Amino acid sequence: MYSIIQKICEKHNKILKEGLEKVLKGADISSLTSAIADFTNEIGKDLLAEIVKQIDELVFEDSKRQKEYESVRFGERKYITQNGKTKFERRYYEDKETGEHIYLTDKILGIDKGERIDKKVKSEIISRANDQSYKKSGKGVVPNVEISGTTVMRNVRKNDWKMEIEEKKEEDKIKAKTIYIQVDEDHIKQRKKKGCTISKIVTIYTGKRQLTRPEKEEKVVQIRRELVNKFTFSGLYKDNQELWEDVVYYIDCTYNKETIENIFIMGDGANYIKEGLNWIPNSVFVLDLFHLEKYINHLNYDEELKKKLQLAIEQYDPISTENIMNEAIERIKKEITEDKQLGRDTKRLENRLKKIEDTKTYFINQWSGIEAHDKYKDKLTGCCQEGQVHHTLSERMSTDAKVWSEEGIDEMSQLRAFTQNGGDVYAKIIDISTAEKREKKIEELEKRIKRKAKRKILGTTGVKIPSLTEARGELYYELKKMWYGIAI
């Protein structure tokens, strides 16, 4: 190993020498740091190719391999690493028993079939794509290499970003009296489709914790809070059963059921949200106040009726609420009749009538969710799902007139939730890569080769970089002059 690194260092020593010379001639230290970066990147690329070559030789020389696999030819692979783009050759083998063709060295090194980008680089571009466009995500990750937006997109889509949920031991499960489940959706423009596609989001938590210190409350515009034990699901979830199965499974794996007293499902009252009541025993639906206010504002055209409606709802009076809505409907109908008699266009009023009739139906259908605010007022902490929708989905997917494919909506929604749940992108890529079961004989070969590599390749790693270690080299004298002020 020593001789390999020494040889590579000598090959690229010129880069480091030029950087030092620039500093001696008056350039600032950035010239040197840039040269050091280029130097280490060149070493990294060549070192990788050399190690692959030596591993390949060990595979070729392995006596047991010779009985099981026939060497067919050499194959070149171009590979993008953190140091830049490199290339290396390794042998292509044929399984004598099955006839299957395989790069054994790739298998040993954990390089997947057809893989052209190192997994660490993949994790970086995917992590960037979580927050910015695919095109921007491929820039500046690898020295002198720009990874295309299409390549970034493919790497996001080829992985399943659903968080793996592991059941906790009973003694480790969260003991909580109340669980809050906020459910909402974002409307995202889909390519080649009229209208928008819905991406659903579920946020599960056990309460809110104030982050703003009490002594600063009067000085800030908004008090900052965070959700306790927060976990997020997101995706298309076209099948509502799949959505609620995931939620129920997470609760079963994470929470101690003996301590749970209340489970509140909060949202706008859509059927798929209320479906959760059938999946989670003793759960209660709570209409979120954002959507309640939105429907109350449908009466903005009539301040008198709107104030009456607000008062009736604040008093949790369903009869008065229905009567006020009936009054609003009758007033509009009367206006329509009068305008028709005068020969005026009534389309605007007819649209308003439809809207107010729908609003009345909404209040009637969601009344139990409205009353829940009164019945459980000591246990509710308020619904903040609109903020969760914006933070998880809208920021990346529905602002600035972005357009997505259906697959892209699903994958990015899952990825955004995955990272917010603390998921490790690199670890996930490795898990997916190693999930495929390998043949026993390849695993045995890998163990043998790694033992030999440790002994034959690693060895001593002491390395001398010529420019820095020559006892009386050119740079030695230049640096000496600089120290004593002879050279400027």
Language-model segments: which ranges?
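N-terminal accessory alpha/beta regions
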Residues: 45-68
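Short Cys/His-rich metal-coordination motifs, predominantly Zn2+-binding knuckles/fingers
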Residues: 65, 82, 96-100
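Catalytic center-proximal scaffold of phosphoryl-transfer enzymes
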Residues: 1-49, 93-488
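Short acidic, Pro/Gly- and aromatic-enriched capping/linker segments at domain boundaries
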Residues: 60-79, 370-379
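Extended assembly-interface regions of large multimeric machines
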Residues: 59-60, 83-86
